[in-house]
Amino acid sequence: SGEEIELSSSNYVIFQKLKEYSNFRSEKSKSKLPEIIKNIALIYQAGKVRLGFLIMACTLAGIAVSPSSPLSAMEIFALAVYVLVASSTSGAFNQWYERDIDAVMDRTKDRPFVTKELEPTNTWNLWLVIISALALYATYQVSNLEATLYLFAGIFTYGIVYTVWLKRWTWMNIVIGGLAGSFAVLVGSAATGNTFAPAPLILSVVLFLWTPPHFW
């Protein structure tokens, strides 16, 4: 009947509109994907995540050389992630703070805060403080206060002592800054309750002594 034809025609129109909307959403999502990937890559670069993985490895080494560990595999994995995140926040602050001197060096002139692919606003510092605080709290939840304090010491050493207080003023900046890696080892040993065991202490000292000649 005419009514059925009209209803069928109406359904067809609705179907076509829904299809067009679905295609529009799909194309819009596709167009945003490269931008999302680019932003992730920029944040990865700004946070010095590769260095963060080395710091994380130091924590795992601290756990490995400790005489015993009450931590489960999941707790070790979680602690490693929290150390990586905390290290990356101090790395990002380092690049934000040094963007003026980074701009005049060939090796660093393409960093995201220099090129302003990431706008160097103070909002970044707020987020970095929040993320650092969350990483510290999470570390406390999965381990103990001592490990958390060592992690804070590492963040503070690299982010403030090395970046703000020393780097522009003395050649000793690398020497003192090397403590950040040593603290990472102690995070691992403290999490197992073996901070003052000989092996992790020796490893932290060796790492401290290795850092200056490695960078020089």
Predicted regions and their residues:
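Alpha-helical transmembrane segments of multipass membrane proteins
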Residues: 60-64, 132-137, 159-164, 185-190
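Membrane-embedded alpha-helical segments that form the functional core of polytopic membrane enzymes
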Residues: 57-99, 149-160, 200-210
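Acidic (Asp/Glu-rich) catalytic motifs at the cytosolic membrane interface
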Residues: 87-114, 212-216
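Multi-pass membrane catalytic core of lipid/isoprenoid biosynthesis enzymes
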Residues: 107-149
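Membrane-interface helix caps and helix-loop-helix hairpins in membrane proteins
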Residues: 140-145, 164-172, 189-195
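Transit-peptide-like, low-complexity N-terminal presequences
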Residues: 1-42
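Small-residue-rich segments of transmembrane alpha-helices in multi-pass membrane proteins
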Residues: 57-60, 111-112, 175-192
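Interhelical loop and helix-boundary elements at the membrane-water interface
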Residues: 39-51, 113-121, 161-180
